[in-house]
């Protein structure tokens, strides 16, 4: 009888997001081996013991405090390390310091002989995903960012609450930057085939400006959480586990991720949030959604801002790249 494939994950960054992601992996029985890397070694040691204490009630898993060299035979390296977003800061404000942190991570991971898939969650995620691709020299299909996964989930939640349906039954996407320039695709977003925009028109009691209100609520949700409790981690930690499961289980699932543009939406040389198909080999297909003129303009504006910030940050930090 052939042995079952052992899935191994190396998590880099054991802060609020990283530890929540690790707990989600344990709770859902995702992967059989998890190594945790962080600049604070004792924290990873403590988390490894604490997380292992949860396994008797779920599924066996080898969990340990790891080094970068342990990535050599990993299937997935997940990067959540970076300076956290503070009250009043945008995700783009983090770019220079987190580019430098990222450079110190990617280089030793690549030097370890790692030949798997990078999944990036640190912010600004679109820029750091593109930077990981450039720093690593990896093929584009093996560097993926969490993109607008969390934003899309928030949108589905808000629409579900409004229409009194399960958020999992809401077909909706947020596209663009995981940040202030993201936008909902109202020309597509629907529940059971009925566009949300048409539903709002049929229910005037929700208000004629409801679509704009939903957009603002979703885009500002992170700021609201950060102002109240200091950081966001449950939503993104769970979203990361969901992406991980889709990759390791070869689900060929469509998810809103930060992926490379090669002419989609008229964009090039940038990673940005759009639906994409992922499986065990990483990125399988980038899906270009049909957008109306207003949405296309928003996508271009989002990409333009990302590109300007990214190019300036690469120049100012002088981080080493391979491509």
From Swiss-Prot:
It holds the Pfam family Ldh_1_N. It is an enzyme of class 1 (oxidoreductase). Disulfide bonds: none annotated. The keyword Nucleotide-binding does not apply. Its EC number is 1.1.1.27. PROSITE patterns: L_LDH (PS00064). One of its GO terms (biological process) is glycolytic process. Substrate binds at residues 85, 91, 123-126, 151-154, 232. The keyword Transmembrane helix does not apply. It catalyses: (S)-lactate + NAD(+) = pyruvate + NADH + H(+). It comes from the Bacteria. It is found in: Cytoplasm. Pathway: Fermentation; pyruvate fermentation to lactate; (S)-lactate from pyruvate: step 1/1. SUPFAM superfamilies: LDH C-terminal domain-like, NAD(P)-binding Rossmann-fold domains. NAD(+) binds at residues 17, 38, 43, 68, 82-83, 104, 121-123, 146. Homotetramer. PANTHER family: L-2-HYDROXYCARBOXYLATE DEHYDROGENASE (NAD(P)(+)) (PTHR43128), L-LACTATE DEHYDROGENASE (PTHR43128:SF16). This is L-lactate dehydrogenase 1. The gene is ldh1.
């Amino acid at each position: 009888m052939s042995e079952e494939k052992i899935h191994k994950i190396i998590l880099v960054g054991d802060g609020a997001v990283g530890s929540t992601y690790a707990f989600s992996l344990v709770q859902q029985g995702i992967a059989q081996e998890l190594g945790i890397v962080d600049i604070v070694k004792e924290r990873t040691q403590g988390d490894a013991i604490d997380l292992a204490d949860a396994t008797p009630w779920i599924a066996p898993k080898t969990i340990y405090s790891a080094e970068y060299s342990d990535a050599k035979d990993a299937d997935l390296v997940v990067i959540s390390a970076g300076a956290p977003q503070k009250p009043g800061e945008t995700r783009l404000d983090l770019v220079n310091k987190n580019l430098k942190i990222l450079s110190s991570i990617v280089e030793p991971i690549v030097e370890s002989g790692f030949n798997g898939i990078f999944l990036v969650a640190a912010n600004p995620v679109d820029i750091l995903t593109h930077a990981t691709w450039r720093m690593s020299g990896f093929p584009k299909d093996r560097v993926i960012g969490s993109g607008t996964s969390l934003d899309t989930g928030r949108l589905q939640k808000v629409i579900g609450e409004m229409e009194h349906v399960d958020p999992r039954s809401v077909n909706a996407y947020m596209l663009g930057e995981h940040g202030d320039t993201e936008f909902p695709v109202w020309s597509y977003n629907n529940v059971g085939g009925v566009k949300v925009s048409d539903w709002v028109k049929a229910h005037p009691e929700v208000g004629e400006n409801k679509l704009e209100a939903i957009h603002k609520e979703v885009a500002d949700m992170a700021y609201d959480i950060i102002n109240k409790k200091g950081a966001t981690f449950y939503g993104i930690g769970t979203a990361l586990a969901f992406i991980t499961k889709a990759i390791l289980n070869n689900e060929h699932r469509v998810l809103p991720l930060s992926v490379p543009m090669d002419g989609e939406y008229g964009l090039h040389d940038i990673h940005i949030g759009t639906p994409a198909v992922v499986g065990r080999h990483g990125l399988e297909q980038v899906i270009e959604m049909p957008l109306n003129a207003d949405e296309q303009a928003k996508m271009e504006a989002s990409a333009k801002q990302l590109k300007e910030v990214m190019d300036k940050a690469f120049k100012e930090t002088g981080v080493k790249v391979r491509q």
